[in-house]
């Protein structure tokens, strides 16, 4: 029996999404309510990519829209991320085994910050879990897709090796962390390899609907190595490169899902 349900992609930025919907892919984009949806197929596999905009609220809202309207077989997220560890370089790719909403904290009366690892509960009203495991089958399929694949080198810098694929925890919040001690704290607390502003929110909504989820990120900056260049020149480079390698691995994953259809 052929599964006709689509795969939904929730992607923050057009600069990321465009690497997957290349000219000649047959992709068609139209608004569905407020959401730009791009539809294309990989073999028999229907794909709907929704550009959510940046941030936890926007990506959660886009995911709820996607699931309620399209009843997907799974939800995928890809894009760029900032490293939480020193030995990653721009161009490295992370298969997210977990996503954590790392800004879900309590600041107690002493000023100490305590991560709320599970619930904020008042009566019967809870926020829910803040750590979300990716679907095991999708992780395994992404690992298979990454075998014998070499991500393209980052065009600038002096990385001592070619980009590589890793697996680990993605941290998410409406925060861009540049302070080295804070990066170290987040990595120690959560074992995060990198941070973005969407994955955990998408994972939470997908989990509420029991829809399998996976996130794939590529490293666009490592503040331990070089402070992010916010100049026009630096922004121009990022616009060209962000999400490119994560998109390529996502396409390889989609091709394998199409074969299994």
Regions found by a protein language model. Name each.
Residues 1-71:
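N-terminal short beta-loop-beta anion/metal-coordinating cradle
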Residues 18-21, 85-87, 104-105, 225-226:
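Short glycine-/acidic-enriched loop or helix-start segments at secondary-structure transitions
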Residues 33, 54, 98-101, 218-221:
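Short, acidic/turn-prone active-site loops that include or flank metal/cofactor-
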Residues 50, 76, 94, 166-171, ...:
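Hydrophobic/aromatic beta-strand patches that form the interior of the parallel beta-sheet core
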Residues 85-190:
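Mid-sequence, gly/pro-rich, charge-dense loop/helix-turn segments that line enzyme active sites
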Residues 171-228:
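A C-terminal functional module that forms or caps the active site or interfaces directly
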Residues 223-261:
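His/Asp/Glu-rich mid-to-C-terminal helical/loop segments that flank catalytic regions of hydrolases
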